[in-house]
Curated annotation (Swiss-Prot):
It comes from Pseudoalteromonas haloplanktis. The gene is pepQ. Splits dipeptides with a prolyl or hydroxyprolyl residue in the C-terminal position and a nonpolar amino acid at the N-terminal position. Also catalyzes the hydrolysis of toxic organophosphorus cholinesterase-inhibiting compounds including nerve gases such as diisopropylfluorophosphate (DFP), O-isopropyl methylphosphonofluoridate (sarin), O-pinacolyl methylphosphonofluoridate (soman), and O-cyclohexyl methylphosphonofluoridate. This is Xaa-Pro dipeptidase. It comes from the Bacteria. It catalyses: Xaa-L-Pro dipeptide + H2O = an L-alpha-amino acid + L-proline; diisopropyl fluorophosphate + H2O = diisopropyl phosphate + fluoride + 2 H(+). Belongs to the peptidase M24B family. Its EC number is 3.4.13.9, 3.8.2.2.
Length: 440
């Protein structure tokens, strides 16, 4: 924690400088950032799990407290309005005394509707940053989520401070503990539900604390890209296991994926090993000055090579790419920025005005197309799947004649493969946070 405290000072200074620059540029007196508020379920007295405004948690590691506000102008000490009610029904957050508290002038808020007297009186040149526009309007804000401000902040959030990088390393440490426990639970014959519980136990984080819904898939379920069901019964036969799961540290996310063959031998195990080798090489290809979209193209070339090498498609790799067959087996992007959000912002931006960096032709669904630069953090997550609906579409095209349908049927019980690491780009080196923690 001592290291984080030292790095946090520089982090706050960086956020202050960014705020000062954009406020001067847009003629604003400051930003008022709202943590959010609890959402009640329809016709009920229960609330959905609270998810904090990412602009709020970028300033401080308070991710579980609604009705908080930050008032910041980039020059003066930021003001934190911290919600701390008198409440015998729920746990009340402790008064802030952590390493970050000294960087804020803190005022306690007893009731959400009492916040107006703690906010700037004249709000004409203050911009509200948050989700609840009706609340902002009721409080007298006329400037809400201005696009030039958001574009500027989103663009610069791709450049992580040293504090943020340390938080991401810690998130990876926690997640890797979970992945190792989940792997062991799979090889011990566990169900998807059993594996999920093993993961949560190892990370010491609840399901609601995870940065996204864990994907814990066995056998054919590995072909469902965003599979978030947890089957309580173990299958009669364990073939394969795909886990896409992260962890949270101070509001920053890990996002890691692994795929395993239960028997650790046979053609699917060989395919997993081959994909892992390609994934590692793709990770090593991250270099300042390259466009991330170009790595996505390289990934398709590598997927085509796998399809050819394993006789799934009876064509040389170059022709598989030319005929656009790879998108049937690899229908998503190579990866994305990672930070305070799992799919972190700024991935499509060419500059701080928000100018769009177009994806490569024929690849419209990427989550990142940006120029790679130092202090950025990326996921690298190639995949190869046997998805019934996409294979059905392929079977209606002229390309069906080149598919080894017998081989496809043999692989279907395994569902698919995805391998994902979290990588920091430094000026003259790469830091694979995930593999540095010895997750195979």
């Amino acid at each position: 924690m001592e290291k984080l405290a030292v790095l946090y000072a520089e982090h706050i200074a960086t956020l202050q400088q960014r705020t000062r620059t954009i406020c001067e540029q847009e003629g604003l007196e400051g930003l008022v950032i709202h943590s959010g508020q609890a959402k009640r379920q329809f016709l009920d007295d229960m609330y959905y799990p609270f998810k904090v405004n990412p602009h709020f948690k970028a300033w401080l590691p308070v991710i579980d407290n609604p009705h908080c506000w930050i008032v910041v102008n980039g020059s003066d000490k930021p003001k934190l309005i911290f919600y701390r009610p008198i409440d015998f029904w729920h746990k009340v957050p402790d008064e802030p005394r952590d390493f970050w508290a000294e960087y804020f002038d803190i005022e306690l808020l007893l009731q959400p509707d009492q916040v107006e007297k703690l906010l700037p009186y004249d709000k004409a040149k203050f911009a509200y940053i948050g989700e609840y526009l009706e609340v902002a309007q009721a409080l007298g804000f006329s400037i809400m989520n201005p696009e030039p401000v958001l574009n500027y902040i989103h663009y610069h959030r791709a450049y992580k401070t040293q504090y943020e990088l340390e938080c991401l390393r810690n998130a990876n440490r926690i997640a890797v503990d979970g992945h190792k426990a989940a792997r062991d639970a799979f090889f011990n014959g566990g169900s998807e539900f059993d594996i999920q519980q093993a993961y949560l136990m190892a990370t010491r984080q609840s399901e609601n604390e995870m940065p996204y819904g864990n994907i814990v898939a066995l056998n054919e379920n590995c072909a469902i890209l965003h599979y978030t069901h947890f089957e309580p019964k173990a299958p009669q036969t364990h073939n394969s296991f795909l886990i896409d799961a992260g962890a949270n540290f101070n509001g920053y996310a890990a996002d890691i994926t692994r795929t395993y063959d239960f028997k650790k031998q046979g053609e699917f195990a060989d395919l997993v090993n081959a994909m892992t080798a390609h994934q590692i090489e793709l990770g090593k290809s991250l270099k300042p000055g390259l466009l991330y979209g170009d790595l996505h193209i390289d990934c398709h070339n590598r997927i085509a090579q796998l399809l050819s090498d394993f006789d799934i498609v009876k064509l040389p790799a170059a022709e598989i790419v030319e005929r656009q067959i790879t998108s049937t087996f690899f229908p998503h992007g190579l990866g994305h920025h990672l930070g305070a959000q799992v799919h972190d912002v700024g991935g499509f931006m060419r500059d701080e005005t928000g100018a769009h960096q177009a994806p490569p032709e024929g690849h419209p669904f990427l989550r990142c197309t940006r120029l790679i630069e130092k202090n950025q953090v990326f996921t690298i997550e190639p995949g190869l799947y046997f998805i019934d609906s996409l294979l059905g579409d392929l079977a209606q095209t002229d390309n069906k004649q080149f598919i080894n349908w017998e081989k496809v049927e043999a692989f279907k019980p395994f569902g698919g493969i995805r391998i994902e690491d979290n990588i920091i780009v430094h000026e003259d080196s790469l830091e694979n946070m995930t593999r540095n923690l010895l997750l195979d």
